[in-house]
Amino acid sequence: MSRYLIVGAGRSGINAAQLLIKVGEDFIIYDGNENFDTAAACEKIGRDNIEFILGDFSGFDFSRVDICVVSPGVSLEMPIMKAVKEHNIPIWGEVELAYRHDKGTVIGITGTNGKTTTTSLTYDIMKRHAKKALLVGNIEIPYTGYALESDKDSVAVAEISSFQLETMVTFKPHVTAILNITPDHLDRHKTLENYIAIKESITKNQDENDFCVLNYNDPVLREFGKTPRCKVIFFSSSEELESGVFLRGDTMIIKENGVETPVCTTKDTSLVGMHNYENIMAAIAMTHAMGVPLDTIRQGIKEFTAVEHRIEFVAEKNGVKYYNDSKGTNPDAAIKAVCAMPSPTILIGGGYDKKSSYDEWVATFEGRVKELLLIGKTKYDIAAACDRAGFKAYKFVDTLEEAVSIAAADAESGDCVLLSPACASWDMFKCYQQRGEIFKDCVRAL
């Protein structure tokens, strides 16, 4: 039996503890919050006699620990993690721990944007085909919460973030996808090169019997496609590929061994925007690699509905359409949302600073965004990008509620109001979901 140190007592840490109890392993929990409610955590975990270390760990004997399981929100540069590394203790993430107890097949999906939509669609298709399909990972359902439910016939469809990939050791999905790579989380990963390397590492344990799905339109991924040991399947929204999945007109086509097979058209889905067509093609490529019949893939695509908080239509009030894109937490995602709007748009943006550049986002405003309402810590940085681009139609606002009120007053019939912050939510909200729910509540109250 091994002794585990769980670092981070949030949802992932709680789920890791519950899994370790079920498999008979012992553990200690560390959390940096000295006032952490240990009684509430014990109640969630289902055990009373749990050893906690809170805040200061200077007196802790690391020789008591064999393995460290770290929550994805915990930076590996935190003092506790530096101490773990200094004591040469193996570091696993929640995904790694879960994978070691998963008896079935895994599909792992990463990328800067589109992960949640693609993972959800892939799961919707797989659950029509597999005896048991599980939706797990960075998509509100920790993998550790479901790994023990797996069997040899189950398929776990996992959304995997860059934070989770940092602590991957043996994780080996049968099918992976890297949807796209644009700068994100540079506050944690420091450089774009580091971020790219972490994203690409999802394939590192795959072999010639496995598959990796890559976006041919992304030059980084097109070049990376030459290196994996596994079989590479490209998808493209702009190039007719010799092999892979591509868009011709409004038809999505699989081409393999010189034979073209139409799968569906853009009219067959409720999803809108070229970015979503790329997400669909990635899901087609992955599920086709898993042996799912084309009729099943088509049915899944036709019946799939949009993911909450991702260019989600909320309501139409006085001829103005309101869209919630709270999940647009980086500039590239926000660009896609702005470009998907069907008419002139009042945009609400700003939030937690992830050290992103906003210039490319602001460059899309001309002819699309009639007014920008800025909230959060990044509002002055975004305003500076607007000034550089000559875009002057912005206002500083203190709260999201105030932004919705101003947008409603300034909008004309036929306009759109879009919340797409291009930033994380942590400066003003617990999470992007809370930000999106508050936006929707404000719209409904108009």
What is the predicted function of each stretch?
Residues 3, 19-22, 43, 59-63, ...:
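Phosphate-binding loop of NTP-binding sites
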Residues 9-10:
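Glycine-rich Rossmann-fold phosphate-binding loop(s) that bind the pyrophosphate
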Residues 25-42:
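NAD(P)-binding Rossmann-fold cofactor-contacting core
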Residues 43, 359-414:
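C-terminal helical cap/extension that packs against the catalytic core
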Residues 48-60:
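Glycine-rich, highly charged phosphate/nucleotide-binding loops
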Residues 55-56, 92-96, 229-247, 298-302, ...:
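Beta-strand->loop->alpha-helix junctions that form or flank phosphate-binding loops
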